[in-house]
Amino acid sequence: MVYCNAQNNDVTQKVEGKCFDGYIFSEKYVGFNPLGDIDKFTPNESDIVKAEKILKEQIKDLNKDLLNQVGNCPVIHKKLSKYKRQYVGTKTENGDKVIWINFIWSKDKDALVKLSEEIIIVLDGCSYYWSVKVNLTTGKLFDLSINGSA
């Protein structure tokens, strides 16, 4: 079951499922966008459920190198439910729908304060902070980016 609640600012929507919790950023969002000047769309509940299903099925293989996941840093595919998410919908030149998912460790209270208001970018922090893209049209997970350590 998924629950969505519109936020007061009309730019984000709360979305929750059995193993995920986060915010959908609408195409109206004008704050900092790490994806640059792109063709955006607003994902709906079914887009997020599909993206999370693809993520769950494919992240272990995509994460086989375990980049920046040593010592005290979590192995991301084993701790998916420990991350809060931010979802941004984009479209490719071919018209494919892609969702960029930004993952923030759920115990980082400072970062979580702004989770519904702006895209959170953290430098360093190893695998406590990472992102990935999901092509909803092709069903492929790609462009895994895991923060490094200082």
Predicted regions and their residues:
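Surface-exposed acidic loop/strand-edge motifs in secreted or periplasmic proteins
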Residues: N9-K114
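Extracytoplasmic electrostatic interaction patches
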Residues: K97-A150
